[in-house]
Amino acid sequence: MGRRILNDALRTIVNAEKRGKASVELKPVSTVMSSFLKIMKEKGYIKNFQVHDPHRVGRITVDLQGRVNDCKALTYRQDVKANEIGQYTERTLPTRQWGYIVITTPDGILDHEEAIKRNVGGQVLGFFH
């Protein structure tokens, strides 16, 4: 049975936020995890992250900001069409004002707002709020 790298990393971030830590170290590294963290940084949920030695097992150091309440990766990839993204966000996120769903699309890994703008669907990786 393989490890769920993205799920483990996001759980580590949530646990560190709950304990009031300033930073957290994530191991091992994946490109999907880096893209997920990039979206979290763009939306202001984490301060910064640095990838150390990405060609080996590597690690990522994440500087936390204290804004993450919950962050989960879906262990099953759920397909979402471009016109169904709004319905999916209403079911998944607590309110419409905050929180983001991360979707892997043919245009790359995007948050749900950008996927709606580009009118592309894909598979849901996870969400954070």
From Swiss-Prot:
Disulfide bonds: none
One BP term from GO: translation
Superkingdom assignment: Eukaryota
Pfam families, per database record: Ribosomal_S8
GO cellular component: cytosolic small ribosomal subunit; mitochondrion
Keywords of this entry: Mitochondrion, Ribonucleoprotein, Ribosomal protein
Location within or outside the cell: Mitochondrion
Keyword Transport among UniProt keywords: no
Chief subcellular location: mitochondrion
Gene3D superfamilies: 3.30.1370.30, 3.30.1490.10
Listed GO MF terms: structural constituent of ribosome
Keyword field contains Ribosomal protein: yes
Family affiliation: Belongs to the universal ribosomal protein uS8 family.
Quaternary data: Component of the mitochondrial ribosome small subunit.
NCBIfam families noted in UniProt: PRK04034.1
Name by which UniProt lists this protein: Small ribosomal subunit protein uS8mz
Native organism: Arabidopsis thaliana (Mouse-ear cress)
Lineage: Eukaryota, Viridiplantae, Streptophyta, Embryophyta, Tracheophyta
Gene designation: RPS15AB
